[in-house]
Amino acid sequence: MYLSIIILPLLGCIVSGFLGRKVGVKGAQLITCSNVVITTILSILAFIEVGFNNIPVTINLFRWIDSEWFNIIWGFQFDSLTVSMLIPVLIISSLVHIYSISYMSSDPHNQRFFSYLSLFTFMMIILVTANNYLLMFVGWEGVGVCSYLLVSFWFTRIAANQSSISAFLANRVGDCFLTIGMFAILWSLGNLDYSTVFSLAPYINSKVVLIIGICLLIGAMAKSSQVGLHVWLPMAMEGPTPVSALIHAATMVTAGVYLLMRSSPLIEYNSTVLLLCLWLGAITTVFSSLIGLFQQDIKKVIAYSTMSQLGMMVIAIGLSSYNVALFHLINHAFYKALLFLGAGSVIHAVADNQDFRKYGGLINFLPLTYSVMLIASLSLVAFPFMTGFYSKDFILESAYGQFSFSGVAVYIIATIGAIFTTLYSVKVLYLTFLSNPNGTRAYYNYKPALEGDLFLTLPLIILAIFSIFFGFITKDIFIGLGSNFFGDNSLFIHPTHEIMIDTEFAVPVLFKLLPFIFTISFSIIALTISEFLSELVIYFKLSRLGYNIFGFFNQRFLIELFYNKYITNLILDLGGQMTKILDKGSIELFGPFGLEKGLVNFSKNISSLSTSHVTTYALYILVAFILYLLYNYLSFNFLPFLIAGLTILTTI
């Protein structure tokens, strides 16, 4: 059963990719979708067997690298963390496969698309089930390649190609540091196997743990789009909407958070790494929320909300609340996939226009889509008793429950980020569905926007159910005080970092309710201003101050401008100079060009000795004879100098 979870998506990828013409579009869709659905059912059974019974399963297939001091076995382990990650990955993957049947129906490259989707699912399974860092790195690179292939799926569009290259290069920065971290683990511990590394972690130098932790954190920053290496995520929205839902909301972007959770037995032994995680997550949350408020592309707004929620997960990791981070990761996957698929339904209905300022009044045409996007937005803003409420508010409470300066400061910053998250969620819903119609007449009269078929709507309904009930049902499993779900030590919390009881019982009720109170009040204020004081808003936006503020945040804090002007150009200039001086200069001079020129000059000088005069040859013979006689009287040590002198004379 456990091997089937890994192999079935790969079989679907191979059949759809290599035999696509034989099986046809319908055959490729049927094979890939059925394989992923079967894999999802098996993963739910694995979740029950491994998670509830605390019976980790390890499968060793074959020895991959076998040397005197370094051994790697191609093996997989299924513990509580692994099966918990498989649930959102495979459920959302299967729903996205089904959704894509309708969404991509008019595309001529269906087989290639479904092959890429199945390959991505396979690589993600490799990443979360690997039992060592090297095999995990195979899955890590695999999902990066699949992201590149899927973002540039419509390869005739220049923007799609630019975005895919941007995503690939930004992730290479993180991959470079992750590789350095793996080398540091190998150098200090002699192995990359999880069980060996984690059992030896308490006994190594704290500074080594700091270096390893920072390298792993930078790797996670790139993959999970934390501030600094976040530039690729909004650009990756150029791919098809099902790709955005699968990769850039639910699965691949959570790989960095998964890496930090998996490495919890390592990073728990250095509080500096945890403090870096705490502040990095807080800055990312408020940074992305501010940018998201000033975007007009519906998919980019949702992308920035993804970045904000990933910041929340990193905050939870910085608080050593790994189970809360995992719980929020799973909850977020469901409602964020629902938001993306709902946005895809809207885009599909309005002839592929993504600027939500041109929508308006779509509630009458897309009632189901409005309902599911309302559910997903309520879950995103942590409305009471929705799925997101149980995890997001618990992270904020955990920050306050640490009762330290950093904890309270991060609580305030993350609450501000949550307020902005609410504002742009209300903005998207209001301008898309509730405001006056702003679109062209084609949306409403000639070619009215309509709900999609069963393949488009069924995944939305299933994800809406998860977005309402999943958090309530699984709260006690993941973050309950008496839960033994992680009894297999897949997540490790150092006893001095345990704050669960303080979070549950010591945080004042006011600070538990504060995010919700601010969320509701600011939403009401924003709607009131938009509805009744719209002229004031327009005057402010047209003023010099409003123009500058809007431009600064709309241009994403000008970070891309800074990168292009000062970092990218610097690297390109450095590369150009290195090419000019080293590659085309000294290497050519001492290498092929210089060697060839020297040999030609040497041969010309040698050939000039041939003068065709007998007296000259007699002189050469006489000189050689004298040198032979001198050789017997001179020390052997002078011979090299003599030969060198003759060589110089002949080349002049």
Curated annotation (Swiss-Prot):
Keywords, alphabetical: Electron transport, Membrane, Mitochondrion, Mitochondrion inner membrane, NAD, Respiratory chain, Translocase, Transmembrane, Transmembrane helix, Transport, Ubiquinone
- Supply the enzyme class, top level: translocase
What's its catalytic activity? Answer: a ubiquinone + NADH + 5 H(+)(in) = a ubiquinol + NAD(+) + 4 H(+)(out)
GO MF annotations, alphabetized: NADH dehydrogenase (ubiquinone) activity
Q: How does it sit in the membrane?
A: Multi-pass membrane protein
Instruction: Give an example GO cellular component term for this record.
Output: mitochondrial inner membrane
The Gene Ontology biological process terms listed for this entry are:
ATP synthesis coupled electron transport; electron transport coupled proton transport
Give the UniProt subcellular location, in the record's own words.
Mitochondrion inner membrane
Q: Where are the transmembrane segments?
A: 1-21, 30-50, 72-92, 119-139, 140-160, 177-197, 200-220, 241-261, 274-294, 301-319, 331-351, 365-385, 403-423, 454-474, 505-525, 619-639
- Which Pfam families does the UniProt entry name for this protein? NADH5_C, Proton_antipo_M, Proton_antipo_N
Its Enzyme Commission number(s) read: 7.1.1.2
Entry's family note: Belongs to the complex I subunit 5 family.
The job of this chain, per UniProt, is described as: Core subunit of the mitochondrial membrane respiratory chain NADH dehydrogenase (Complex I) that is believed to belong to the minimal assembly required for catalysis. Complex I functions in the transfer of electrons from NADH to the respiratory chain. The immediate electron acceptor for the enzyme is believed to be ubiquinone.
What name does the UniProt record give this protein?
NADH-ubiquinone oxidoreductase chain 5
**Organism annotation:** Podospora anserina (strain S / ATCC MYA-4624 / DSM 980 / FGSC 10383)
